[in-house]
């Protein structure tokens, strides 16, 4: 544990939570709609099923339930929460869904806002929250990753509809003068490769009056160049984690767990191989939930903590990566 000077501020990770919808969509059921099979999907992605939000479920509701579970694990009074950051690319309200979660929680003293960085979103939000805490601005923060990608999937495209699901996860973080359990982090973006994975707007051109033009509409469906995204992930993710190891004087042998964005089992295995991290250290629940974007990391984290796989003071190397293109890594000590 890294002990800090009394005039410095570190962070401690106090609780986790998660929520997934009750509707389960299996590979077999998808194969009734598009030309695919359970064996084909599992062999290429590692996914067996995914959760799909019901008509009454949305990002705010899922995020609220995950956040509440994290608060309960941390044993916090709701009134003591200062900051809520929601990582999402599929907000229930385009102007922001975090305030709705704040209201549902009754966290009246907290400022709440959304952060959009797709599948890197939760990691970026955790890093953002810790900087507020370490600066002394706030004491307690809830970071939530919640996404409802099923609303933006082309369910007739067998290349992409097999990948995505819905869910939410959360983390309770607290400032402390005793130690710092955020050992190090790094974040990157490359907009030049943004077209490899995006969700473009779908606009209709119109006029208010003559010569005053405008466009209206919403969004299309997820567009992805799977081959390029795979090459990006298996190259950049090991590099950013390895550079973080060097910066923090860590290595693959010193970590207990590798927690990656749950995008594709082949990516998880390839990153582990390139970092010389044994498969026993790679956390994965991809088979049950698929790619839930900003929710994948906290979903897996909460599952591993509640199953007592991750224990106090375990070292976790984690990385989020995806649309933007964006990617990042962090080394954390649980507790």
From Swiss-Prot:
Gene3D superfamilies: 3.40.47.10. It is an enzyme of class 2 (transferase). GO terms for cellular component: cytoplasm. It comes from the Bacteria. Residues 262-266 are annotated as: ACP-binding. Coiled coil: none annotated. Its EC number is 2.3.1.180. It catalyses: malonyl-[ACP] + acetyl-CoA + H(+) = 3-oxobutanoyl-[ACP] + CO2 + CoA. Pathway: Lipid metabolism; fatty acid biosynthesis. Keywords: Acyltransferase, Cytoplasm, Fatty acid biosynthesis, Fatty acid metabolism, Lipid biosynthesis, Lipid metabolism, Multifunctional enzyme, Transferase. The active site is at 119, 261, 291. One of its GO terms (biological process) is fatty acid biosynthetic process. Belongs to the thiolase-like superfamily. FabH family. Catalyzes the condensation reaction of fatty acid synthesis by the addition to an acyl acceptor of two carbons from malonyl-ACP. Catalyzes the first condensation reaction which initiates fatty acid synthesis and may therefore play a role in governing the total rate of fatty acid production. Possesses both acetoacetyl-ACP synthase and acetyl transacylase activities. Its substrate specificity determines the biosynthesis of branched-chain and/or straight-chain of fatty acids. Homodimer. The last Arg residue of the ACP-binding site is essential for the weak association between ACP/AcpP and FabH. HAMAP family: FabH. This is Beta-ketoacyl-[acyl-carrier-protein] synthase III. It comes from Prochlorococcus marinus (strain MIT 9515). The gene is fabH.
């Amino acid at each position: 544990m890294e002990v800090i000077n009394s005039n410095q501020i570190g962070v401690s990770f106090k609780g986790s939570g998660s929520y997934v919808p009750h509707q389960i969509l299996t590979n077999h059921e998808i194969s009734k709609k598009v030309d695919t099979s359970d064996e084909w999907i599992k062999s290429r992605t590692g996914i067996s099923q995914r959760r799909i939000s019901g008509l009454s479920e949305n990002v705010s509701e899922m995020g609220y339930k995950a956040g509440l579970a994290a608060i309960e694990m941390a044993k916090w009074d709701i009134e003591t929460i200062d900051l809520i950051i929601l990582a999402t690319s599929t907000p229930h309200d385009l102007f922001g869904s975090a305030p709705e979660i704040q209201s549902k929680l009754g966290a009246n003293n907290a400022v709440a806002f959304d952060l959009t960085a797709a599948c890197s979103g939760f990691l970026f939000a955790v890093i953002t929250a810790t900087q507020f805490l370490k600066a002394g601005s706030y004491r307690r923060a809830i970071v939530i990753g919640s996404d409802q990608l099923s609303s933006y999937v082309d369910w007739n495209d067998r290349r992409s509809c097999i990948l995505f699901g819905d869910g939410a996860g959360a983390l309770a973080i607290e400032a402390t003068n005793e130690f710092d359990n955020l050992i190090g982090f790094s974040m990157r973006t490359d907009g030049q490769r943004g077209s490899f994975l995006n969700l473009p707007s779908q606009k209709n051109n119109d006029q208010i009056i003559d010569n005053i033009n405008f466009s209206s509409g919403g969004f299309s469906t997820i567009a992805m160049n799977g081959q390029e995204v795979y090459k990006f992930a298996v190259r950049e993710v090991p590099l950013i984690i390895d550079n973080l190891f060097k910066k923090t004087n860590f290595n693959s042998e010193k970590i207990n767990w590798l927690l990656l964005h749950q995008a594709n089992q082949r990516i998880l295995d390839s990153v582990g191989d390139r970092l010389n991290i044994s498969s026993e250290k790679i956390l994965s629940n991809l088979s049950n939930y698929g790619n839930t974007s900003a929710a994948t990391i906290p979903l897996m984290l909460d599952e591993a903590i509640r199953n007592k796989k991750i224990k106090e003071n375990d070292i976790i190397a984690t990385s989020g990566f995806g649309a933007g293109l964006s990617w990042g890594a962090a080394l954390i000590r649980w507790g």
